[in-house]
């Protein structure tokens, strides 16, 4: 939005109608994921969108003028203009956009929000509500509204409180908020990490899994998309945390819990501050110190001899790991608005005869069909602490078998000498070659595609890709190999050293009913085979 105000609205209309794919080549359209909307939206709808974009961008850059004092009336006006589309006019979370949100918008009539400075189940403070409005909720459809005038945000706090009877009752009874205090984080130590690991395995791994990837056995009971019960947070990706990923943020989340979710509070009556800090210290070891940066090109180092299919082999430990972000496919129905798999890591190597990719990605829901073919390590049932044990032990649940398999496809252009194909599985003039692995068969199948709707499986003589797969504690790992040169050059990528090779990825989460066009996709990246 920083640059949109410097462009004429006619330019924006053109971009929306034509998308990235329809723009002239000099604008590098193949690097744009922007779909063309000329066949989906009317001209009138596009101009309404443009009006909204320019008005919103203008608000971000406008200098604040004189503001009226915060009021209920102003709060209602701003709420109906900005918030009711998701939260509904009455605040019940049933606005027209609710079906396109995951998790669904907060039911404000209940008086609860996830991120508070108060204890689990208690109403938030005015400051908590103001912060939620200002900052939004990271990785959800709830945006931050810091561009709104401060008094408008304060007015929203007043109006939001009017939607629930709990705030008025709280005031009439003369109650005051009990704020959770967070002290200075103590230094980590070997002893603290050992204590934290023991506490985590007993108290947290049932939901978050032993590696923190959200694959704990309790998810079979608490996760249900149809009821809006979402997966436990993937603790190995702290850049996705709603509140933040500082040690103080983690401490506060543990002490307050997340109201209306399965994440409980860790009460001071049961857990001392020292124990909470021990858990925090251990949790920080489950993730890299910062979000990995995109690495392109993906370097395939030249090695001698056979390329190992052992995931722990030195060749893979020494190879450069490239972080590849993924997003939901949104151009063609069925669309993937909220994909589970948001990124993957890839390494590469070649030996002048074969090229191999080692790919791993987090998926908290194992497809149990893979157990027939490959090594699988699932997070075990943790030993329950005494205060949580019931009179009768719970019967373990059988893992549900999803209707669709988990899958991944690696995509290349068929020809390196022609214009790069459209990143969404090519186009009519520029086909792509795909290697698709699936848990259903544990095989890689080669396809050619001329777009999302035009895939064709190659015949058996062309199926020469080899794979090895495993699943360990919420993460799939795959080694996929093929010869550099094969005989079917009209339908298969022919690898060359010392030149850029476009590469892209598609991922399907079968538990989330992803199949066909409903999937995560990457844009084009570059693979480089060292000479």
Model-found features: residue ranges?
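Extracytoplasmic electron-transfer domains, predominantly the class I c-type cytochrome c fold
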Residues: 1-53, 100-160, 221-284, 435-439
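Sequence/structural segment immediately N-terminal to covalent heme-attachment motifs in c-type
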Residues: 12-18, 49, 69-88, 188-213, ...
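Aromatic- and Gly/Pro-enriched helix-to-coil junctions and flexible linker segments
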Residues: 51-56, 63, 78, 82, ...
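Extended surface/linker regions that mediate inter-domain or inter-protein docking
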Residues: 52, 145-198, 210, 282, ...
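Short acidic/polar inter-strand loop motif in beta-rich domains
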Residues: 56-59, 164, 287-289, 510-514
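Electrostatic cytochrome c docking/interface patches
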Residues: 58-78, 167-200, 290-299
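Short, solvent-exposed loop/turn and secondary-structure capping segments
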Residues: 61-64, 88, 95-99, 142-145, ...
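Structural preference for beta-rich elements and adjacent junctions enriched in aromatics
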Residues: 289-531
């Amino acid at each position: 939005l920083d640059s949109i105000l410097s462009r004429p609205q006619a330019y924006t209309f053109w971009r929306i109608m034509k998308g990235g794919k329809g723009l002239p080549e000099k604008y590098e359209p193949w690097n744009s994921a922007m779909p063309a909307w000329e066949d989906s939206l009317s001209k009138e709808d596009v101009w309404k969108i443009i009006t909204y974009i320019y008005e919103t961008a203008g608000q971000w850059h406008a200098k604040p003028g004189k503001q009226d004092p915060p009021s209920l009336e102003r709060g209602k006006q701003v709420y109906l203009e900005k918030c009711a589309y998701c939260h509904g006019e009455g605040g019940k979370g049933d606005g027209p956009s609710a079906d396109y949100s995951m998790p669904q918008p907060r039911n404000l009539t209940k008086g609860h929000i996830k991120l508070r400075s108060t204890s689990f189940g208690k109403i938030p403070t005015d400051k908590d509500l103001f912060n939620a409005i200002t900052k939004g909720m990271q990785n959800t459809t709830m945006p931050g509204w810091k561009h709104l005038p401060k008094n408008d945000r304060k007015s929203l706090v007043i109006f939001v409180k009017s939607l629930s009877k709990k705030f008025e009752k709280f005031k009439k009874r003369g109650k005051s908020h009990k704020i959770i205090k967070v002290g200075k984080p103590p230094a980590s130590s070997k002893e603290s990490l050992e204590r934290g690991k023991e506490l985590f395995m007993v108290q947290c791994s049932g939901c978050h899994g032993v590696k923190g990837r959200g694959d704990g056995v309790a998810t079979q009971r608490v996760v249900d998309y149809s009821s809006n019960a979402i997966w436990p947070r993937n603790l190995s990706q702290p850049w996705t945390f709603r509140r933040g990923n500082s040690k103080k943020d983690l401490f506060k989340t543990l002490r307050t819990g997340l109201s209306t979710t399965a994440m409980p509070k860790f009460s001071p009556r049961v857990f001392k501050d020292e124990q909470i800090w021990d858990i925090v210290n251990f949790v920080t070891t489950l993730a890299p110190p910062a979000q990995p940066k995109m690495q392109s090109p993906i370097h395939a180092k030249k090695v001698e001899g056979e390329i190992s299919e052992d995931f722990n082999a030195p060749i893979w430990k020494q190879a450069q790991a490239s972080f590849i972000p993924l997003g939901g496919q949104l151009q063609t129905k069925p669309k993937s608005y909220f994909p589970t798999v948001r990124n993957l890591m890839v390494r590469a190597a070649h030996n002048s005869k074969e090229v191999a990719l080692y790919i791993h990605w987090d998926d908290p829901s194992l497809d149990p069909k893979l157990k027939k073919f490959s090594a699988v390590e699932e997070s075990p049932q943790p030993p329950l602490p005494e205060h949580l044990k019931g009179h009768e032990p719970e019967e373990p649940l059988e893992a549900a078998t999803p209707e669709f398999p988990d899958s991944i496809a690696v995509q290349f252009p068929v020809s390196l000498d022609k214009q790069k194909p459209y990143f969404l599985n090519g186009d009519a003039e520029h086909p792509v070659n795909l290697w698709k692995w699936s848990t259903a068969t544990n095989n890689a199948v080669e396809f050619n595609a001329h777009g999302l709707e035009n895939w064709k499986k190659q015949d058996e003589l062309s199926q020469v890709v080899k794979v090895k797969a495993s699943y360990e504690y919420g993460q799939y790992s795959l080694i996929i190999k093929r010869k550099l040169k094969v005989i079917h050059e009209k339908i298969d990528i022919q690898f060359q050293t010392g030149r850029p090779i476009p590469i892209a990825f598609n991922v399907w989460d079968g538990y989330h009913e992803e199949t066909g066009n409903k999937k995560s996709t990457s844009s084009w990246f570059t693979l480089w085979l060292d000479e």
